[in-house]
Structure formats: C-alpha cells, structure tokens
C-alpha cells in the first residue's frame, strides 16, 4: 500500500554542525586518494561523530565504510543517523508529509543514512523494513536519486 504525501513545501535540513561535513569530505578524499588506510579513515570518522553526534554525514560515512563486511555495525551506524536525521527534520518543521529532496544538500546525509539502512536491512533479511524504507525514500525524494525500483 503506497503512501502518497500531499504536495507541500519541501523541507531543507540545516547543514551538519560547524565544519563537520567538510571534515568528513576531507577524510573521504584522503582515503580515496590512498593517503590514509581504512582504519585511519574509520578513526577520523569516529572522532568526528564523537565531537559532532548530530553530523549525519559522519554516520552515513561510517555505515558506508562498514558495508558489506560488517553489516550489523553498518545497520547500527545508519540507524543512529536515521534517528538523528528525524530529530533534525522535526526541528526544521517537517511534519512527516513534506519532501526532503536530494537536490537540497542539507538533506543528503539523512537520505544516505536512510538508503544505507535499507541496504543493511536487505543484507540481514528484514524484508518488511526494506519495503517501508524504499517507499519512504521514494516519497521523500521523488527524483529517485538512488535508482530504486518503484513499488
């Protein structure tokens, strides 16, 4: 059963605190360039998440790094980011009916956490959760940034 959100003004989440998103991006760039190991990258992300527990991009990056090798850790990281994102969305006036689109950069950490949670739920066989998250993602961001199959 599809839930169809009424057309309301989309919500744009405020950015991650201070320069935490930039710190995450810099750590990722160094890791991708081979300038740091996975362990060092994880340590940087852990430090950012500890300093800025509301940094959605840090939780998303931690989950993405954990997949596919440590699905349970990934699931936990994404779940924390998802709940932190819901808190931020509600604090920004989101009432559960507006879109949170990928095109708005402030929303990307939350959407990455939600997508990652769906991927981790798939890996552990949580079919009902996968379906709910997929439907939720498509309703939040109709542009379908993640290329999900429409239900």
For the regions a language model picked out, list residue spans one by one.
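Alpha-helix N-cap/N′ positions at the starts of helices
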Residues: 40-43, 109-113
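N-terminal alpha-helical interaction modules that lie
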Residues: 1-57, 61-94, 122-151
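Solvent-exposed loop and edge beta-strand segments that line ligand/cofactor-binding
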Residues: 50, 101-106
């Amino acid at each position: 059963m599809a839930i169809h959100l009424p057309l309301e003004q989309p919500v744009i989440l405020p950015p991650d605190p201070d320069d935490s998103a930039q710190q995450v991006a810099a750590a990722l760039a160094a890791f991708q360039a081979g300038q740091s190991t996975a362990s060092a990258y994880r340590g940087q992300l852990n430090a950012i998440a500890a300093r800025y527990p509301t940094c959605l991009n840090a939780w998303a990056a931690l989950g993405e790094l954990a997949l596919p090798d440590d699905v349970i850790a990934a699931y936990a990281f994404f779940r924390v980011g998802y709940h932190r994102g819901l808190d931020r969305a509600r604090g920004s006036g989101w009432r559960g009916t507006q879109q949170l689109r990928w095109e708005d950069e402030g929303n990307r950490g939350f959407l990455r956490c939600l997508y990652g949670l769906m991927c981790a739920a798939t890996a552990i066989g949580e079919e009902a959760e996968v379906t709910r998250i997929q439907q939720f993602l498509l309703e939040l961001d109709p542009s379908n940034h993640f290329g999900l199959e429409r239900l």
